[in-house]
Amino acid sequence: MALSAYDLTGRAALVTGAASGIGRASALLLAEAGALVHCADRDETGLRRTYDLITGAGGSARTHPLDVTDRDRVRAAVADAGHLDILVAAAGIMHTSSVLATADEDLDRVLAANFKGVLYACQEVARSMTARPAPGSLITMASGAVDSASAGLLCYSVAKAAVVQLTKTLATELGPHAIRVNAVAPGWIRTPMTDRHDAAGQHRAEATMARISPLGRVGEPEDVAHTVLHLASDASAFMTGQILRPNGGVAMPW
């Protein structure tokens, strides 16, 4: 078995949030492992850059400009992609406000992107997989924020906690169809999203996370992408309903 378990030749993956950060790194690594990668994002410029990086390295990719909060667009992208073996639901946004300052529209916007967008992608891809039928792997993106309380991150943390429960429920329901469902809950990862968030605090959060990590650094998108590849591949054939935490040891829940 060895490294052949990570060979995705002949498989197809849909990656949302593929224009940057964790989504892009995951798309690149899945393509390097041999998968045809369907890259989806609302940022068309970033999406084209991801496509160019994949194809420039000899990989195979297609692009699907879409907003994951639009169920009809997600459904259309899944139909256009056709056969899918893997989903990486990595699209998401961050919002910062205290609990008392959180407005309805703030909560609605974050839940739409970070929970409903994941739900829509999982529903549409799972329907496609069960209709064939064929085994598959759905990978959701949770967050280390579900393991601790962080001031200002109510909307984000609530949405990511919902993703964890969605993942476990889907794993229970889809297991009989040979579809595995797992979540990745990264710690602080250096991405355009976290850079924008941390800039307001003069990058104190990143420095703090690096200091408290036993490994002495924050993560890079590639650190998470390798976890995604593991879950997408046959190397994790007996894993479902699990939450994997590439976080540098910042949190160690049992």
Please describe what each predicted stretch is.
Residues 98-99, 103-111, 205, 209:
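Substrate-binding pocket helix/loop in short-chain dehydrogenase/reductase
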Residues 183, 187, 207-235, 239, ...:
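C-terminal helical subdomain
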Residues 2-4, 148, 229, 240-254:
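Short C-terminal tail/terminal secondary-structure segment
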Residues 122, 159, 167:
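Active-site helix of classical SDR
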Residues 143:
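Residue(s) in the substrate-gating loop at a strand-loop-helix junction
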Residues 88, 175, 180, 239-241:
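Short, small/polar-rich loop/turn modules that mediate ligand/substrate recognition or access, typified
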Residues 127, 172-176, 237:
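Alpha-helical segment proximal to the catalytic Tyr-Lys
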